[in-house]
């Protein structure tokens, strides 16, 4: 796998305790399973549990449907078992590469996956950690606003994002149905809520769904420290405040569109 593995014991425990009976009606109709084109986006700020929930959702769905793909975010993506995303983020934080170079690297990871996993193919369930759009509108914008990226660099990155979305038919947030998921408490409860919505979406022909994860401030900081990524721990705290505000605003917009 080219994403961060989660313990098989956790996968088995969650699957054992999640009610998936709602899939039976879908699976008994071959016409339903052969014509599913559905994009699932697991999004949110840093430390809200995106990777874990995206991977658990993948583990559940891949055993039920024929063509399920997962698209980890750059920080979870591995090349030859090396977390290149984490290395690149360290270089950016320590100013050994420019913010613009780093943001193009993030889009490189997206484009590599979208191309080689056949994102634009029909009859596929795609699970994405965030959208490419978020990389630019939240994270690149922070670098642009504080002067790390020039006006020309900002324009070039935005143009590249538009081209990627168009070429691979990637949805944007405003095109997606939205559901906010509280991931403060038992993980199995959050996964169950997501599975219930996925079942309804497939039955009703929904094509794009964003699940926005939320946790309280103490919980997300505890997760950042516990998983021990130096690149995250060394980041300035006001950066996380910006990320949290961005996703809070995004959730409000998507909830009331």
List the predicted regions and their residue ranges:
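A glycine- and Lys/Arg-enriched "phosphate-lid" helix/loop adjacent to the NTP-binding pocket
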Residues: 136-249
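Conserved lysine of the Walker
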Residues: 50
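The conserved Walker
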Residues: 46
């Amino acid at each position: 796998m080219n994403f961060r593995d989660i313990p098989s014991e956790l996968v088995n425990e969650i699957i054992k305790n999640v009610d998936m009976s709602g899939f039976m009606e879908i699976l008994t109709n071959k016409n339903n399973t052969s014509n599913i084109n559905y994009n699932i986006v697991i999004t949110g700020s840093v430390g809200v549990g995106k990777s874990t929930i995206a991977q658990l959702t993948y583990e559940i769905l891949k055993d039920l449907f024929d063509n399920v793909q997962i698209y980890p975010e750059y920080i979870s993506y591995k090349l030859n078992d090396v977390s290149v995303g984490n290395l690149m983020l360290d270089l950016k934080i320590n100013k050994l590469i420019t913010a613009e170079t780093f943001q193009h690297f993030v889009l490189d990871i997206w484009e590599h996956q979208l191309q080689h996993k056949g994102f634009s193919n029909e009859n596929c369930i795609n699970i994405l950690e965030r959208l490419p759009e978020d990389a630019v509108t939240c994270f690149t914008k922070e670098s642009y606003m504080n002067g790390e990226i020039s006006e020309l660099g900002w324009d070039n990155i935005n143009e590249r994002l538009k081209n990627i979305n168009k070429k691979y038919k990637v949805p944007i947030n405003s095109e997606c149905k939205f559901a906010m998921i509280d991931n403060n408490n038992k993980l199995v409860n959050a996964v169950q809520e997501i599975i219930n919505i996925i079942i309804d979406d497939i039955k009703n022909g929904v094509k794009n769904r964003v699940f926005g994860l939320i946790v309280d401030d103490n919980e997300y900081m505890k997760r950042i420290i516990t998983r021990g990524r130096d690149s995250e721990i060394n980041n300035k705290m006001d950066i996380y405040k910006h990320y949290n505000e961005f996703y809070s605003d995004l959730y409000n917009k998507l909830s009331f569109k």
